[in-house]
UniProtKB/Swiss-Prot annotation:
Belongs to the TRAFAC class translation factor GTPase superfamily. Classic translation factor GTPase family. EF-G/EF-2 subfamily. This is Elongation factor 2. Catalyzes the GTP-dependent ribosomal translocation step during translation elongation. During this step, the ribosome changes from the pre-translocational (PRE) to the post-translocational (POST) state as the newly formed A-site-bound peptidyl-tRNA and P-site-bound deacylated tRNA move to the P and E sites, respectively. Catalyzes the coordinated movement of the two tRNA molecules, the mRNA and conformational changes in the ribosome. It comes from the Archaea. Residues 18-262 form the tr-type G domain. One of its GO terms (molecular function) is translation elongation factor activity. The modification Diphthamide is found at H604. SUPFAM superfamilies: EF-G C-terminal domain-like, P-loop containing nucleoside triphosphate hydrolases, Ribosomal protein S5 domain 2-like, Translation proteins.
């Protein structure tokens, strides 16, 4: 099918929302996700049939092609016919490596269905479980593709009966996850049932695949598959691919089981839109109204060397056209759309308009970042905080400092880092004001390594880096007394105490149930019912910062307090960015303002006076409340032959890790463990060495946990020394005179 014709067809079909499907392909790293996408692409006539699988057309960054893993979510629109009717399938390829799971979260928001790819030999790995859980939370309907079935024959030498048993076991495992994480109203209808055709078995590399109904129609049995591979005749595998082509099996399943945007928005909008569901804007989204006010949710920002910043996202209401004025809800900025287009692989094709339910690319929204929402400018006052924030499963926990090898490249490097952090909102770029270092924080070592390679390839920058540093958090374990914080001019006094937040509160804030901009009574009710708070105290929460600390105003009748409250809250946020122990962010602390004396003259109560007063009282409180450091822990999920179990558990224990569970199936042990990120630098090579290269494993961020007391002081000193701070522990007297 010639390519130019496809663009026209795709654009005309996009106008009929019942003919549109938005899907993603999600899987663990290396389970064959991008190869699957390529095979689908080839069938749409967008890359040639011959090179699919080798082309890795969606892995369009050369970093991805060298490493053979997908780093960016790429978008593409495919064309597929079923029973003579044409459909547009918007396909978003998402990364499977844990360091990039922030991108998966952003992609899921714009999907209605997902193809979950599982390697028939490795089965369900950590990442598969995480991403399936995320997709069920976002009400994205899964269909299953069990890939690499050829490995069961070539490597494990299974018979056709044994293969079928293995596949049934995998389906049961997936259904158990849907039972665990699915919402009650969806889980039964979303479960995988082979006889319906919502699971496909095949090999993306060899381009064959079938569902049970398709195999019945075409007269293909598992024994035919076994014969094709055991005969050693390549032609038999090719014959299989022409009889049951994988793209047909998968795309037929997508059209049949993934809902169109009009159907899916009816149940997805109530989940992701937290505003009034009877408002005009919510109704337009629920009904996928092409004539409604424009609402576009942005899941990706890319820097195009020629066009500038390109925002990619899904149109949830209205029709996107150039010249529209939109309001960016998070950035609180008005922007004008200059151009709209659709994706064909890495190439954007211009379009006059992109209607509701589709994935669009737009120029002109330079202030947007992924997770942003653009709405019709007329509705700017009615959408504040109405979209549920995206929840990332991990947070940046590893930092390196970067400097250009050639000092002349400094401004070029600053510009490149800025662009990288726009494209990847899980990459944090900071400047250490005192040392002038440029710090880059990411989700893990691979995440940073790939970012450095992008600096080199896209911007021609050669940089020097420090070894990776783990990011810590400061916290407390007791309640403090009330401390008086004085302003430098002694005219303002604040009376503040601190105490630790309980785990329920931290979880409620981390998962977005409790948000700063919620109604106070609603927040207090949730905290009382789910986190053991006193209702009246919870009503007095006035701020929640990004590291999960809360500020409570427990004062009554203090003169001039309202006029300075904004300044106090800024002071609180600043103090919590760098705690007193090691200048690391503070996490999980409740700060209570009991009383205050405020000077009547505004000239005597500006930020220069109030910031130190807030900070000093909070820091004195922290230092007297059994302060500690929290370190990030990683979950490990390792599969190894039984004979290596002892060696592998020894590696985990040596790295201050602990084994949580070991499950044995046949000769394979599956080890679940937790290990501090700080100890995981050489983990890959040690696991390989201890298992003769036969360990499969996955990692993901688990939680923050207190550093053992035995190494606490030593660690604080090391961090202070690295940051050029005095090598002694701070004392209360340093903050309270």
């Amino acid at each position: 099918m010639p390519r130019y014709k496809t663009v026209e067809q795709v654009l005309s079909l996009m106008k009929d929302v019942t003919r549109v499907r938005n899907i993603g392909i999600i899987a663990h790293v290396d389970h064959g996700k991008t190869t699957t996408s390529d095979t689908l692409l080839a069938a749409s006539g967008i890359i040639s049939q011959k090179v699919a699988g080798e082309a890795l057309a969606l892995d369009y960054l050369s970093v991805e092609q060298q490493r053979g893993i997908t780093v960016k979510a790429a978008n593409i629109s495919l064309y597929h016919e079923i029973d003579g009717k044409g459909y547009v399938i918007n396909l978003i390829d998402t990364p499977g490596h844990v360091d990039f799971s922030g991108r998966v979260t952003r992609s899921l928001r714009v999907l209605d269905g997902s193809i979950v790819v599982i390697d028939a030999v490795e089965g369900i790995m950590t990442q598969t479980e995480t991403v399936l859980r995320q997709s069920l939370e976002e009400r994205v309907r899964p269909i299953l593709f069990i890939n690499k079935v050829d490995r069961l024959i070539k490597e494990l030498k299974l018979s056709s009966q044994e293969i079928q048993k293995r596949l049934i076991d995998l389906i049961i495992e997936v259904n158990n996850l849907i039972e665990t994480y699915g919402e009650p109203e969806f889980k039964d209808q979303w479960k995988i049932k082979p006889e319906l055709g919502n699971v496909v078995f095949g090999s993306a590399k060899d381009k064959w695949g079938f569902s049970v109904p398709m195999a019945g129609k075409r007269g293909v049995k598992f024994s035919d598959v076994v014969n094709a591979y055991t005969s050693g005749d390549k032609a038999k595998i090719e014959e299989l691919a022409s009889k049951v082509p994988i793209h047909e099996a998968l795309l037929d399943a997508v059209i049949k089981f993934v809902p169109n945007p009009r159907d899916s928005q009816k149940y997805r909008i109530p989940k992701i839109w937290k505003g009034d569901l009877d408002s005009e804007i919510a109704k337009a989204m629920i009904n996928a109204d092409p004539n409604g006010p424009i609402v576009m949710m942005i899941n990706d920002m890319k820097v195009d060397p020629h066009a500038g910043l390109v925002a990619t996202g899904r149109v949830f209401s209205g029709t996107l056209r150039a010249g529209e004025e939109v309001w960016l809800v998070n950035a609180k900025r008005q922007q004008r759309i200059l151009q709209v287009s659709l994706y064909m692989g890495a190439i954007r094709e211009l379009a006059e308009e992109i209607p509701v339910g589709n994935i669009a690319a737009a120029l002109g929204m330079d202030a947007a970042r992924s997770g942003e929402t653009g709405v019709d400018i007329r509705f700017k006052d009615s959408v504040l905080g109405s979209f549920e924030k995206l929840h990332y499963i991990s947070e940046p926990v590893v930092t390196i400092s970067v400097e250009p090898r050639n000092p002349k490249d400094l401004t070029k490097m600053i510009d490149a880092l800025r662009k990288l952090s726009i494209e990847d909102s899980n990459l944090v770029v900071k400047i250490n004001e005192e040392t002038g270092e440029y710090l880059l924080s990411g989700m893990g070592f691979l995440h940073l390594e790939v970012s450095l390679q992008l600096l080199k390839e896209n911007y021609g920058l050669d940089v020097v880096t420090t070894p990776p540093i783990v990011v810590y958090r400061e916290s407390i374990r007791n309640k403090s007394q009330v401390f008086e914080g004085k302003s430098p001019n002694k005219h303002n006094k604040l009376y503040i105490s601190v105490e630790p937040l309980n785990n329920q509160t931290i979880d409620l804030i981390a998962n977005g149930t409790i948000k700063e901009d919620m109604d106070n009574k609603e927040m207090a009710k949730i905290l009382r019912d789910q986190a053991e708070w006193d209702y009246d105290e919870a009503k007095k929460i006035v701020a929640i910062d990004e590291n999960i600390n809360v500020f409570i105003d427990a004062t009554s009748g203090v003169q001039h307090l309202r006029e300075i409250m904004d300044t106090l809250l800024q002071g609180f946020r600043l103090a919590m960015k760098e705690g007193p122990l090691a200048f690391e962010p503070v996490r999980g602390v409740k700060v209570v303002l009991h009383d205050a004396v405020v000077h009547e003259d505004p000239a005597h109560r500006g930020p220069a006076q109030l910031y130190p007063a807030v900070r000093n009282a909070i820091f004195a409180g922290i230092l007297t409340s059994k302060p500690t450091l929290l370190e990030p822990l990683q979950k490990l999920d390792i599969r190894i032959p039984m004979e290596y179990l002892g060696n592998v558990t020894a590696v985990i224990t040596r790295k201050r890790g602990k084994v949580i569970n070991v499950v044995q199936t046949g000769n394979v042990a599956r080890v679940y463990a937790e290990i501090p990120v700080g100890e995981s630098f050489e983990l890959a090579s040690e696991l390989r060495a201890s298992s003769a290269g036969r360990a499969f494993w996955g990692t993901e961020f688990s939680r923050w946990a207190p550093v053992p007391d035995s190494i606490l002081v030593d660690l604080i000193m090391k961090i202070r020394e690295r940051k050029g701070k005095p090598k002694q522990l701070p004392k209360v007297e340093d903050f309270i005179s």
